Regions:
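Short, solvent-exposed helix-loop connector elements
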Residues: 47-55
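C-terminal catalytic domains of large/alpha subunits in multi-subunit enzymes
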Residues: 33-34, 46
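Feature 926 captures the class I aminoacyl-tRNA synthetase adenylation module centered on the KMSKS loop
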Residues: 3-30, 54-469
């Protein structure tokens, strides 16, 4: 039998029967019995168990991520009512993210079995948290639209089944650790889509992995793609560019092997980052501009008192003129500088480089390459950003009004900012599609609105109103 030596307070103090203590019944009532069990399970047996309500809240937040996967599935399953009783997924129809999640679930299942056999439940808890994060912040995030789009029912069913396999496996694996939460999910998730399942999660055999799936290195490809997304997101944050603001180009400087790995996820990368194009480059110099400066050591004898005048001339040259001069200097030709009568030897100039305007970059881990963003915003990109900001605010007011996800609505958007209204008029069909809106009033309001709200979009106030269609 393995057990922890003692339970101590979260700040390291010892509990006492006559002094500071937390009664189990009180803790179970306040943070839940499963949370208490989860805290204990997550502590290595070689250490004392630290226990307290702050740690309990942290553990509960981690369990909430698992719960939210169930909530997401349940929300859309209420509409579509998927049933897997006699369902066999078409593996050839699976997307790369589908294959990744099945392979990732098999991997989690294998690790969980080994850790249970080794009595290393605390390591299982950590693996579970990583697995839940993978499902939430990669699979669901990149496949959300598949669960509510209409038309391709086969693809939607595949997405349901893959998510079911992952969530069901996690529920079975974690049932000894968090028995009450897993039982609730079993009854309200597994037995709804697979009615012939055992009547309790605690009466099940150990789950079996899905065999016969060609992964083709999908786990590594996914890891590289996620790193590119995370790095580019960090660059966005540093430049204070919201994800809803589209950008023109993502540059990835890498070798051909890395480029091939992420090729299958190009669309997902661009969608996640809200960027129009991805360009692969083999040298970061592509992201730099060359320009000339005066080589003072040599130029002094030639230009004498006109050295600073030449410096000022170079600083005011157009981009085209500078490009021509740089090319001439690099070839060692004599150089004619606009505004000057004489030609000059190439050695009185120095070729320098600087990052192109609007380009920001960062290196990937382990020398895998460099990621760069073009942050220059054109009028079209700015208008599209206004539209996406407006759609986001409208989605929030829909939710605040308490509508079901499938509810058709009427929406009104009123603003004194003509730039906002002008941008919205160009994208009315897109806006209606995103909001499930049968009617969209721009520049007016609704007489029967269920909820009206004023929000900030762009540089001004926008008044939103929503009603059921």
């Amino acid at each position: 039998v393995l057990t922890n030596s003692a339970v101590i307070a979260e700040d390291g103090r010892k509990f006492s029967k006559t002094g500071f203590m937390i009664k189990f019944d009180e803790a179970a009532e306040k943070i839940g019995a499963d949370t208490v069990r989860y805290l204990y399970a997550g502590a290595p047996v070689s250490n004392d168990v630290r226990f307290g309500y702050n740690l309990g809240d942290e553990a509960r937040r981690k369990l909430l991520s698992y719960w939210n996967i169930f909530t997401f599935f349940e929300t859309y399953a209420k509409i579509d009512k998927p049933n897997f009783e006699n369902y066999t997924p078409d593996k050839s129809a699976m997307t790369p993210t589908d294959i990744w999640l099945v392979v990732r679930t098999n991997e989690f299942l294998k690790k969980a079995k080994a850790l249970y056999d080794d009595y290393k439940v605390y390591m299982l808890v950590k693996e579970f948290e990583v697995f839940v994060d993978d499902i939430s912040n990669w699979y669901i995030r990149t496949n959300r639209r598949r669960f509510w789009k209409t038309g391709d029912e086969k693809d939607k069913m595949t997405a349901y089944w893959v998510l079911y396999y992952a969530l069901n496996t996690a529920t079975l694996v974690m049932s000894p650790v968090i028995p009450f939460m897993t039982e609730h999910i079993w009854q309200n998730f597994t037995r709804k889509v697979m009615p012939s399942s055992p009547i309790s999660v605690h009466l099940c055999d150990w789950p079996k992995p899905i065999e016969g799936l060609e992964d083709d290195g999908i786990v590594e490809k996914t890891a590289v793609s996620r790193e590119i997304i995370a790095t580019a997101m960090r660059l966005r944050n540093e430049q204070q560019l919201k994800v809803r603001q589209p950008l023109s180009t993502l540059y990835v400087c890498c070798d051909s092997e890395t480029a091939n790995k992420i090729g299958v996820f190009e669309k997902i990368i661009l969608d996640e980052l809200n960027i129009k194009n991805i360009k692969y480059i083999d040298d970061v110099n592509v992201l730099e501009d060359k320009y000339l400066t005066v080589n003072f050591k040599v130029a002094g004898a030639v230009l004498k008192q006109n050295v600073n005048k030449m410096k000022q001339t170079l600083e005011t040259l157009s981009k085209d003129d500078m490009t021509k001069l740089v090319s001439a200097v690099e070839q060692g030709d004599e150089v004619y500088v606009p505004g000057w009568d004489d030609k000059f030897a190439a050695d009185i100039f120095s070729v320098q480089t600087k990052t192109k305007k609007g380009i920001v970059s960062a290196e990937l881990q382990n020398d895998k390459g460099v990621v760069a963003l073009d942050t220059v915003l054109t009028d079209e990109l700015i208008k599209e950003g206004l539209v996406r900001d407006t759609v986001r605010q409208c989605q929030l007011i829909r939710k605040e009004a308490g509508y079901e996800v499938e509810q058709r609505v009427k929406m009104a958007i009123e603003s004194l900012d003509t730039a906002v209204i002008g941008a919205l008029k160009e994208k009315t069909e897109y806006i209606k599609s995103e909001l499930l809106a049968d009617e969209l009033v721009l520049g007016g309001t609704l007489s029967d609105a269920d909820l009206t709200k004023e929000v900030e979009i762009g540089d001004g106030k926008v008044k939103l109103a929503v009603a059921k269609a």
